[in-house]
A protein has these predicted regions:
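Phosphate-binding glycine-rich/basic clefts of nucleotide- and phosphate-handling proteins
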Residues: 110-147, 230-330
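Glycine-rich phosphate-binding loop and adjoining helix at the ATP-binding site
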Residues: 93, 131-134, 148-203, 247-252
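Glycine-rich phosphate-binding loop of actin/hexokinase-like ATP-binding domains
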Residues: 61-62, 67-69, 75-93, 156-169, ...
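N-terminal glycine/serine-rich phosphate-binding loop of ATP-dependent small-molecule kinases
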Residues: 1-148, 155-158, 188
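Phosphate/ATP-binding catalytic cores across multiple sugar-kinase/actin-like superfamilies
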Residues: 116-124, 201-204, 208, 361-383
């Protein structure tokens, strides 16, 4: 048996990256939160100096691009939307994109992202302004995404000594990037830190007031590249862990983004012999339908099946019900294709496969090993961490409990674990609205330390040890 229900309101409504939030009926002067950086960026002392009325804050993720429209004078957030990064056609992760650049296809990647930004701008501006009225665009992303967007040489990002083509804040006109409707906009990319820790990580650090926090503070921006930062009494160290796109639904057999039809939550109710599925509903009163599984559903499924011993500690999925004494409602779902999460009347079942579990293990092991390496570098134990921020569009929609059970998050006191949402996007918005905030990113970029995980001998062993699906 299975019970399917609409995902909780906050899971869907709060999923800013996957919906258009239309606030046409609100005005900047009516909104009491227009100066709240959690809701509308920061209205700075420099806002009155902005020559344009409209600006865009963009988070160019490896898998997902998030864009928000702001009115510059009031600081009001007008609308937001996201789309899958069009560059995924040429590779799911950073290394694949760099490989295509080395093979002479960088111009194609540049064209894809620039066209996508113009298309998204047309959509997000509708009802508010023309794209030609956008005066300022602040874009953040990992170093590779920023280099491709700006047409910079990516050869230094592919191998040791890993050297970016530029450092500091990058500014140019949209026309220099071949933009048409955004040709008059000033395009600004805040400073990054190193070849694999980019402007998005700096935006996270800045938006969380990371450097001013007392004690030991850790932040993990979970995405295709998990960027990790550790501040110990003002000393900042960073690294980038290649998590892969599994958390965003990519490279999963029936994976998808967090949109209508996605399984966003999984619970196994042994006492009633049911599997409970939380499914993201469509608009209005459309009936629920199940199409696949998104990142939060993947974590829940792995956690639930691990607790029932359908998945072993090493990540192996049971091949036969006879291997464990399972209740019939679980045993009947073990098939040659994998574990049947959803049984469709039309035969369009949704499975969790062995490959899916391996993709999860690779992603979570990368994050765990990266965190452990930074802690070791600063000679800090996990118990000494005062606050752990989990950032990223994906990070705001997962179960803390299941993330800890599977070993994605460390097992620390619940009050120390803070879900920060899309902190990179918030940082981009703050940089859009405040020149002072923007300049702060340059200071962070030049003062932060960096650990290149690929060059650390112990990283591979740390990574292999972290593959086990257990709390840590």
């Amino acid at each position: 048996m299975q019970i399917i229900r609409a995902a909780a309101t906050d899971t869907v409504k709060g999923n800013a990256a996957y919906e258009i939030h239309d606030k046409r009926k609100e005005t900047g002067r009516q909104r009491s939160d227009r100066h709240d950086p959690e809701k509308a960026g920061t209205l700075s002392e420099e806002a009155s100096l902005q020559r344009g009325r409209y600006g865009l804050a963009v988070d160019v993720g490896t898998t997902t691009v998030v864009m928000e429209l702001y009115e510059l004078i009031s600081g009001q957030r007008l609308s937001g939307l996201s789309r899958r990064n069009s560059q995924t056609l040429l590779g799911a992760d950073v290394m694949m994109r760099l490989m295509h650049c080395q093979r002479g296809q960088q111009a194609k990647l540049e064209k894809l992202i620039r066209q996508q930004l113009e298309e998204m701008a047309e959509e997000i501006c509708a009802g508010f302004c023309e794209p030609e009225q956008v005066e300022r665009i602040v874009a953040v992303g990992n170093t590779t995404m920023c280099h491709i967007l700006l047409g910079q040489d990516t050869s230094g990002l592919s191998g040791s000594p890993f050297c970016p083509a530029y450092r500091g804040i990058f500014r140019c006109q949209g026309s220099k990037l071949g933009m048409k409707r955004l040709r008059e906009a000033q395009v600004i990319v805040p400073a990054g830190i190193d070849a694999h820790v980019g402007a998005d990580a700096v935006a996270v650090i800045s938006s969380l007031n990371f450097m001013e926090a007392p004690g030991n503070v850790l932040a993990v921006d979970i995405g295709t590249n998990a960027e990790i930062a550790l501040s110990s009494h003002g000393r900042l160290t960073t690294c980038s862990a290649p998590a892969g796109p599994a958390f965003e639904g990519a490279q999963i057999e029936q994976g998808m983004r967090g949109e209508p039809g996605a399984i966003a939550g999984v619970k196994i109710a042994r006492q009633i012999g049911n599997i409970l599925l939380d499914v993201i509903p469509g608009p209005g009163r459309e009936p629920l339908f199940v199409k696949g599984i998104c990142g939060s559903g993947l974590i829940d499924a792995v956690a639930a099946l691990r607790q029932c011993n359908v998945i072993r500690q090493d990540g192996d999925l049971l091949q036969s019900p006879s291997e464990e004494k399972l209740p019939p409602f679980l045993a009947e779902r073990i098939t040659d294709k994998g574990f049947m999460l959803y049984q469709s009347p039309e035969g369009k079942h949704v499975y969790l496969t062995q490959k899916d579990i391996r993709q999860f293990q690779l992603a979570k092991a990368s994050v765990q090993a990266g965190i452990e390496m930074l802690l070791r570098r600063q000679e800090i134990t996990l118990a000494q961490v005062d606050t752990l921020y989990i950032a990223g569009v994906f990070g705001g929609h997962i179960s803390k409990r299941n993330a800890v059970l599977t070993g994605l998050f460390p097992d620390i006191a619940p009050e120390k674990l803070v879900i920060a949402g899309n902190a990179a996007g918030k940082g981009a918005a703050q940089a859009l609205l405040s020149e002072t905030f923007l300049e702060q990113t340059e200071w962070i970029g030049s003062h932060a330390g960096h650990v290149e995980l690929a060059q650390q001998e112990e990283f591979q062993q740390q990574f292999m040890d972290a593959m086990a699906i257990v709390p840590w």
